[in-house]
Amino acid sequence: MFENYPFWYTFFTELKYQVVLSPTSTRKIYELGIESIPSESECYPAKLAHGHVTWLIRNGVKFIFYPCIPYERNEFPDAVNHYNCPIVTSYAENIKNNVDELNDPSITFRNPFLAFTSEEILANRLVEEFKDIPAEEVKAAVHKGWEEMAAARRDVQKKGEETLKYLEDTGRHGIVLAGRPYHIDPEIHHGIPDLINSYGIAVLTEDSISHLAPVERPIRVND
């Protein structure tokens, strides 16, 4: 959601779908889906997904799109890989098999396996998935979404550059708070960025400044 939403919103809007989001994560959202969580060992973002899907169902949404995405964009050509964790890769299968309300025949729950490896690979897969829509329309929507995703990333980078300049001009301090995209969710990050801000320290995400310097290799992690 937090990484690829610009793409999906643009893609579905171009195809004349109305995009409906569940509300911001809260404890109530978590509790809404707690009965369908199959294991306490799952990470909190996965548990929250049950509540978000349940909210959509109970608010009359009849078409829910929750793709399984093994591979993200290959942002750095010399990176070893660009795969997601097992939860992101296939958790929609867990949702499908544990949220009983999805058995309602009036609800369409679509969870295709897709790869964000490249625009071409993603477009070809979505053409297969949306066979009732002309292929050229699907490909055009993918292209628009891909451009919007790139523009959103440039906006993040621009803000990072602006923040660094502000720190240089004012002599203030900043911190790079690294994490996964879902750490933008206030229910998951528990207010840590706000706490840091309260001390007069700027918070930057790694993707807001990673373009400013090359990665020193070799590095001692599998990236």
Q: What positions do the PLM features span?
A:
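An N-terminal assembly and electron-transfer interface module characteristic of large anaerobic redox
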Residues: M1-D223
